[in-house]
Amino acid sequence: MTSLIAQWLHITQDLNSALTRQARFDTLLTTIRDVLNCDSSALLLFEDQHFKPLAINGLAKEVLGRRFSIEQHPRLEAIARAGDIVRFPSESTLPDPYDGLITNHQGKLHVHSCIGLPLLIDDQLIGAITIDALDPNQFDQLKNQELRFISALAAGGLHTALLLEQLETQASLPRESYAEKRTLSNEIIGNSQGMRTLQEQIDAVANTELSVLVMGETGVGKELVANAIHHRSDRASNNLVYLNCAALPESVAESELFGHIKGAFTGAISHRKGKFEQADGGTLFLDEVGELSLELQAKLLRALQYGDIQRVGDDRHIRVNTRIVAATNRVLHEEVKAGRFRADLYHRLSVFPLHVPPLREREEDVILLAGFFAEQVRGKLGLHSVRLSPSLVAELREYHWPGNVRELEHVIKRAAVLAKARTPQMDIELISQDFDIKTPTSPMMPTVAASQAQHEIHVDIGLKQATDAFQKQLILRALESNQGNWAATARQLELDSGNLHRLAKRLGIK
């Protein structure tokens, strides 16, 4: 015991001298590996009934992207509930959350040694450390007293790091717990430089009243950014209201935004609040704001300028305290030059512009996100584990992801379903054959050639069937040329966005 404590006291100096929070965490786990001679370890943060990996040693990188629900992982639940050191018997039948994820071991973990150290501050769980060794007798000589010492040291280090983060990034917030404002429901996954910069910008603007314009390609996660801005602000206890401007028929757009009174138009059988009023005191997220007509842009501008709105059919002005976060995949300043977007509205919305980088510029985040989605689909399919094969990891890194994060999510979920269909086992591995990511076309998007082969038009079919086949081919061709962007497709086909979505559903494209 004395020898171990002496080692740790010496190492504490290294922990305190580390320049960054991540460096401290990595040093902690390296020390655990060296002192305890384990094969893998992980430092986990506890929030929203999930364990979130902050640092890992001896585990696949995808683990950093996973969020482990304690309800779905009995070993982690035991650690969370115990309040003290947990030793799992080498013959334990409880599934291990790291099955297939230890870097020097392929496949399911059978007999092995596993210990969980809950990290407690004032008897409140803030995290945990897990330690695994492939030798089932590796930790037999290790005393609980020694493990409690490690746990206390790690708990203090984690607590200090969280407090420093709160002071650095949330100094302007009221005194609520920072964890309440930054939870899994609005978490943005990514450690790349572009995403770290984005996180810093979100933290800077969240607790202001500035309008924010979120820019980025389709599928990068603009809605998630809006969600994070709202939940890290003083408005978090009020509504976040979503409106997809691209799917808004022109005939009802004004009513959707501002509401209407009874009798304002045919079918208006009662008073109805619009999105501005629904978001009063909170945040209104205008997705695809570049799709609004010039007429509606003028009315939106007035609401932003004066802080009041008029319901359709009503002469009264209603004061609203609504913050606007808008998003677009268009280059709005180019739209202004082309006369399709009002310059004054653009300047109102883009007081604080944010750019979400495409996934092809975030190579180091691809595997984190793949792990995140693999853990999600594991829970939904009721599996013990879903892991990525080494060859697949290499392919995921090399692919350029034209559909961005949304495409990655879809292909991981599709591959998991295919893998589950191949085997009755509860532990599955996703392999390259389950993916079709060798061409620029999204794997979830049928190609034009495939559509033409399936829907070649013959003279012996009816007019409606032939018309449907032609429309389907045309929409698929436009979608492919616009990289799956529905709003751009609607413009190319000169269709109302709402009508295009309805037509696509009828034709079986959506």
Swiss-Prot record:
Summary of the function given for this chain in its UniProt record: Required for the expression of anaerobic nitric oxide (NO) reductase, acts as a transcriptional activator for at least the norVW operon. Activation also requires sigma-54.
Keyword Transmembrane: no
Alphabetized GO MF terms: ATP binding; ATP hydrolysis activity; DNA binding; DNA-binding transcription factor activity
Protein name (record): Anaerobic nitric oxide reductase transcription regulator NorR
Gene Ontology BP annotations: phosphorelay signal transduction system
Pfam families: GAF (PF01590), Sigma54_activat (PF00158)
Disulphide linkage map: none
Chain ranges of the Sigma-54 factor interaction domain: 188-417
Residues bound to ATP: 216-223, 279-288
Pathway info: Nitrogen metabolism; nitric oxide reduction
Alphabetical keyword list: ATP-binding, DNA-binding, Nucleotide-binding, Transcription, Transcription regulation
NCBIfam families per UniProt: PRK05022.1
